[in-house]
Each structure stands twice: as structure tokens, then as C-alpha cells.
Design a protein with these regions (language model features):
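Extended non-catalytic scaffold regions that mediate assembly and binding
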Residues: 14, 60-65, 72-79, 114-119, ...
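C-terminal edge beta-strand
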Residues: 1, 158-166
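Extracellular interdomain linker/stem segments of modular secreted and single-pass surface proteins
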Residues: 7, 165-171
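Short beta-strand and strand-turn-strand segments in soluble, beta-rich domains
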Residues: 79-85, 89
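Solvent-exposed, low-complexity, repeat-rich "mucin-like" stalks and linkers
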Residues: 8-80, 174-180
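Strand-loop-strand motifs at the edges of beta-sheets in extracellular beta-sandwich domains
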Residues: 88-108
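A short beta-strand micro-motif common to beta-rich folds, especially ectodomain repeats
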Residues: 129-151
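Short, exposed coil/turn segments at beta-strand boundaries within extracellular/luminal domains
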Residues: 151-158
Length: 180
């Protein structure tokens, strides 16, 4: 079995490796190509489980935002990307199709938030374990998502690696002249 990447997807350089780049707010359909040595697979072999894992780590911290400004009070908590990977994507299968829906940007992640009135600042929102940065591992790679599709009874499987980003649809410069 293999997973065919969706059309029109670009590659993202993780560092040492490259993976497909999927965009926030978009859904993707990938073909689960079934094959054997006889090149004949029946239609009853489409009962799969799907798991999403994260490979690598990110740095999170405490971030506060008020009417007087915003800033980090700490950002040294290293979090295993696998613990938060399911916050960003949902995956399912139907027949021989794997569907991936990218629901949230990496930098929108936080574990919890609290809003209260702080003397001198007014209404202040503090985000706990908000994503601060993505880390590079010893192989030179940034974190990525790994989807594993496994047949429930026969046990064969295939994997698909990707990273998520935000698509830019329009750039509007504020000045009409660029000076070098």
C-alpha cells in the first residue's frame, strides 16, 4: 500500500529532509493505492485505522497580552510535538481515500488562557504553553506530522509526512516606491 500525495502540493524543506506542505484551513484528499504481486486487490480491503503523530519538539512559554502591549515572560518549555500534533489536523479514511483537514496554525496553539484585570494594565490575557518556536533536531530537521494508515485486520500500513503553513493569497505594499 502507498499513499499518493494530493496534486498541487509543494515540498517544504525541514532541514535535512523535505515533506509536503499543507495549508491551514484547507482539506486534502489522498489516494490509498492498494497493490500486490498480482496487481489485483479486491474491494473488501478498505477497512483502515488512522493515527496522527508529531515528530520533533517545539518550545512553548507564557505570553501575556493587554491594552498596554504584549510579550513573553518565559519561553523555555520544550514540548514533544507528538503531544500536541492532534490540535492542528484531523484525518479520516473513506474507502481508498485518506482525508486530511488542517484546522489550526502552529502559532495559534496554547494549552490554556486566563483573562483577568491587572492593576496598571487593565484586562490582561495570559496564555500558558503558547507555541514560541519550532526546534531543529540532531538530524537537522524541524518538527513534522506523520499520518499512519493501517489495515485493521491484515496489518499492512503506509505513512505520509507533511508540515503545515499559512497560505499567502495577496501582498499589498503600503508604499508604491521601493528604494534600494
Amino acid at each position: 500500500m502507498s499513499i499518493t500525495a494530493p496534486t498541487g502540493v509543494t515540498k517544504y524543506n525541514l532541514g535535512k529532509d523535505s515533506v509536503d506542505l499543507l495549508y491551514v484551513g484547507k482539506s486534502y484528499s489522498l489516494n490509498l493505492a492498494m497493490d500486490n504481486i498480482f496487481h489485483s486487490v479486491g474491494s473488501n480491503y478498505n477497512d483502515f485505522t488512522v493515527t496522527v503523530t508529531g515528530v520533533g519538539s517545539v518550545t512553548c512559554g507564557s505570553y501575556s497580552q493587554s491594552g498596554r502591549g504584549a510579550g513573553w515572560s518565559s519561553h523555555s518549555n520544550i514540548v514533544d510535538f507528538n503531544k500536541i500534533a492532534k490540535e492542528f489536523v484531523t484525518c479520516s479514511t473513506s474507502g481508498n481515500t485518506l482525508s486530511i483537514n488542517v484546522t489550526k496554525s502552529l502559532y495559534d496553539y496554547y494549552e490554556s488562557k486566563e483573562t483577568k484585570i491587572v492593576e496598571g494594565n487593565g484586562e490582561t490575557t495570559t496564555y500558558t504553553n503558547k507555541l514560541y518556536s519550532i526546534n531543529t533536531d540532531s538530524d537537522g530537521n524541524k518538527p513534522y506530522f506523520l499520518v499512519t494508515v493501517k489495515h485493521k485486520t491484515l496489518g499492512f500500513s503506509a505513512q505520509y509526512k507533511f508540515f503545515i503553513g499559512e497560505e499567502v493569497s495577496k501582498v499589498s505594499p503600503s508604499k508604491t516606491t521601493i528604494t534600494f
